[in-house]
Amino acid sequence: MAKVNMVNLTRRDKERNTIQTEAEASYTVFEMNGERYFQIDTYGTRGRKEQGKVSQVLQFDEESVKLLIKLLTTEFRF
């Protein structure tokens, strides 16, 4: 589980990349201590032993979401 620190996020170009196996996911938006968060939960692959159990969590606060939108807009040339 991780609250993503977008301030220190850097691009790393790799020599070898792979497409990962698809996994089910959901998202939630919530407020805590006056801050709004966007959270993505993944549930692992279909062959996973414990179906439906959260595998990974990524949380973004409002500032991180703004930086992510800017980054995606640049990288995908929207």
Would you name each region that the model predicts?
Residues 1-78:
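Positively charged, low-complexity terminal tracts
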